[in-house]
Each structure stands twice: as structure tokens, then as C-alpha cells.
Amino acid sequence: DNSGTDQMEKAYWKEAGVAPKGTWFVSAGLGMGEVLTMAGEMRAYTLSDRATFGAYRAKTGLEILVQGDAKMFNPYGIIAVSPKKYPDINHGGAMKLIDWITSKEGQDLIASFRVNGEQLFFPGTGK
């Protein structure tokens, strides 16, 4: 599907020198939730983003086997578009949102967000 997770999976296969083909490999072509459900039913392995896995963990019986690889770091960012290029936008409001998201209060809220007790997002502004 060319998502970030799909691209990461392809990079891992390439780095390992393994062609993901054959009867042992299933290319589902589904959304992450559906893939997790399928992996749970098949008792198979899959690569997943943490947020979707957290939401599906109890439904599938799957457990995390590997985590923490720096290559899996998937940062989110926030930017305001140019008010010169898009004069009808609420640039002031966008800047207030950016200031709040990157503030200690915003970063603390991001860090406190949990699904089933597990932290999904890790602040990275350094403020």
C-alpha cells in the first residue's frame, strides 16, 4: 500500500537480503487493523505501527516481539502553510496551534496519551 509501515517492511527485507516471496509470505493488501486481525487468526508475524497495534492487541492476542529500533522512528511534524501562497487561511490560528502543540503543556498532553495503558506518542520538540 506504500504506507510508511509498508516502506519500512520493504527496507527490512532488502537489508536482510531476503525476497518476501513464497508460501511462507502473505501480502495482504489490507489496512493495518485488518492485517493485525489476519495475523492474529493465522498466528503469524507482522510489522505494525504502535497506535493501531495498541488498539487491536486485545482482539488479536498478538504480542510485541521487537521494538525500539531507531530505524522505526516515525516522527510527526506540524507546520503552517504560507499565508502569501494561501491568503484565505487562518495563519494566526495555525501559529497559535503550533505554539501550543510545541509548548510544555502540549507536549505533556501528547506524552500522556495512552491506549490500553501504553504510550503511543513521544514528544520531540526539545522545549
Show which residues each predicted segment covers:
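Exported/periplasmic ABC-transporter solute-binding proteins
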Residues: 1-127
